[in-house]
Amino acid sequence: MNPLVADEFFRSDSPVDVQATVAWLLANGYGLSSQSGEGAFGARFVFRGPAEVRITVDRSQWLLDVAVEPGADAWQYDLLLAARSGRTYGEVFPARASRQADGRLPDQLPEGVSWRQTLPDVLAWVRGPGVGEAVERASRERFALMRPGR
């Protein structure tokens, strides 16, 4: 998928907030460096700049991951948001049903979070000290919340 086709795909198939996030990335020194898969059933778009932002669509559900630098392991966005907040994972993302009232999965994860509003601050924060440890703490907290019989 060339950049023009990718642009059309975002405009026609992604939520408005995803479109705004991609526009912000492109306006702030990030470029589409790779793409795999096609269509809303499964595709990944990698944007490189000072950090690496990976946008994935899987069965019409949009996800975001961030790597501190291009090529590094990426962290899931919910973990970054919880870690950056300084609060526990459960405080940032209280338990909620994984499906909407009508049975549909949310279009964009984490549910209720605007990527466009939060990503600039996360990208500025992610290069700072102690980020890895904070993300690992959030990961442990999320795991404990998801464990059956907790």
Model-predicted segments: where are they?
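Short glycine-rich hinge loops at helix-strand junctions in the catalytic core
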Residues: G29
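Intrinsically disordered, low-complexity regulatory regions enriched in serine/threonine/proline
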Residues: N2-T21, L32-R44, R48-R150
